[in-house]
């Protein structure tokens, strides 16, 4: 029975996406990954995050909103085509679980995040679902909690797939859609992982 090695969502926020995942996947080796120059690359990432923020994913307690999140999944599929082409995808009532098959049988890694956001109340300097890119920032509900994490994980895997990289162990990407109200999204993912004998 394998156990999962968990990576908190915030780990990907301070470094370029692929560097984070490559560091985790090859912890005993010096990485030859060179962070790209800021500029076009940074703008590409900002535009992806902006598009994700513009798709409103507010979740409400005890309301079936799976269809809303299926729409958000289409945004992810368009932004990260290789992830959707190469990884095994499982959708559980709007919750996502991807499996990236590794070459060995070492302990799997699970990268966790969530797709949902809390309601946008009060006054905003920029409209909450505008995804405006201004003053060196992406503005809007979900930029830090936590679509930036979702984007970082997907972008990292997308870039590594483009390089032809295959991890030495299985890597899972899990993203629930009811985190903001402690709903049943994460427990459903856990149940699937138990079904796979991973926990």
Model-predicted regions and their roles:
Residues 1-7:
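Terminal single-pass membrane anchor helices
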Residues 5, 12-143, 162-167:
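Acidic/His- and Gly-rich active-site-bordering loop/insert found
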Residues 144-199:
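Acidic/histidine-rich catalytic neighborhood of metal-dependent amide-processing enzymes
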């Amino acid at each position: 029975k394998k156990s999962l090695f968990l990576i908190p969502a915030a780990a990907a926020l301070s470094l370029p996406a692929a560097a984070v995942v490559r560091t985790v996947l090859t912890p005993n080796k010096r990485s030859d990954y060179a962070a790209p120059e800021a500029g076009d690359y940074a703008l590409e990432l900002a535009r992806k995050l902006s598009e994700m923020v513009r798709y409103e994913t507010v979740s409400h307690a005890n309301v079936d909103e799976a269809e809303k999140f299926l729409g958000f999944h289409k945004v992810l599929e368009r932004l990260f085509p290789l992830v959707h082409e190469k990884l095994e995808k499982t959708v559980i009532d709007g919750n996502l679980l991807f499996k990236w098959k590794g070459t060995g049988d070492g302990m799997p890694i699970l990268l966790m995040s969530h797709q949902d956001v809390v309601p946008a109340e009060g006054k905003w300097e920029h409209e909450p679902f505008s995804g405006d890119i201004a003053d060196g920032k992406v503005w809007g509900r979900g930029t830090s909690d936590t679509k930036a994490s979702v984007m970082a994980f997907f972008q990292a895997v997308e870039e590594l797939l483009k390089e032809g990289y295959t991890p030495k162990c299985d890597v899972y990407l899990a993203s629930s859609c009811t985190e903001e109200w402690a709903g049943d999204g994460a427990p459903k993912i856990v149940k699937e992982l138990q079904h796979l004998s991973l926990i």
